[in-house]
């Protein structure tokens, strides 16, 4: 009835429990118009909302929620379990749905009542992250149980760290022997690798690592990982001997990491299995505190990783690492980096790939997607991935429909039809879906002229369905930008187009991109202008 009948009790307050109380009260107030008082203990005549008790039956970030007469309890298995439990309570039992940055729906009600129930849940992966502009909304990040690398990795050293730890600009001239030996000479440089058999380099790295951890007390993990670039690993006689014996350049890398892990047994060391180091060594096994960050950068995305040649090579590597390690971090790529504002229909493979990762001992996942506004259905991709990273056994099609109806309202049936048509056209074309694609690659397939006219008709109907709601209309128009951009890119390769009509289409794209804050077309920062 708009008056508090319960109080929030945190017996031993922590930062996470306090954040959970704030989250609960924020949405209780938005629903009912009032907040629940905080109390160090139960109050006579009031029900108690107990936050932060320990739950032994769930893992880190997991939670137990129990509701019985007079008491609602959200208990934690550690980490952010209390906060995530509160978000689940709000979503499942109080009618709040979060969709994207600052975008949520709820039903106002002066009276909030809960049934008796009990549930417990833990995440499939201990670390879950996406690139999404929505992550700038702290409530969104908590709601979708996302983390950030600087919360885990000391000094934010989490990928391609060789040159950050020992810059070639500092050590290259005085100690070229620290760097890769290729074609008869040492090659120090920003993208060179280390000579991993050099004992002096190892001791220097140990000193640097010790300094980094001392500068970041409380942090337990760091990445010691190759610089970006392929086939730049050291081929001096000693490194080459190890790699030939191990059957992969990962051999010398894992031996080096094992030595570090043994020197610092209370720390965890992550390293890349990427490009030349993707496949595991034949003999040496990573120590338990060596984390393998395995990257699927070379894989095509039109089908699950198990179903095409590029994916099967990655799966072979994944299964090989899984045989020797239970500590695998997957870096998965899920958007077109060369043309971010273009259709990328990979939604049908997300669940199967994440289930594959879980099956093969992955404990951490980073989904590199959606860094900018305007990328293909960025909000839906982030929503589905966050849900599936918590539990990869969910129905991906159901998640898609939930999002479309919640975020786009009456336009949802048309956008669902568009997604199914686009996906079907991709698969029927036999054209691979690549993270460095051009829409021109698909002009005879999923982006052919006939289909593009059909897509335009579908979006016209979607816009008309929400024409009286400026917020929903804006969301639909932003979702349409990838089709508009693709039409313009394809037109550049063709003769006979109506120049005046194309000029109008260019101006419409520019205007809508500016209206919705879409500024970047690819990861090289090429702008709309």
PLM features: what roles do these ranges have?
Residues 270-298, 341-348, 373-382:
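Substrate-binding cleft/loops of secretory-pathway carbohydrate-active enzymes
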Residues 13-23, 27-29, 58-255, 259-265, ...:
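Feature activates predominantly on carbohydrate-active enzymes
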Residues 388-529:
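Catalytic domains of carbohydrate-active enzymes that cleave complex glycans
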Residues 55-59, 269, 354-358:
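Aromatic-rich surface patch/π-platform used for binding flat ligands and interfaces
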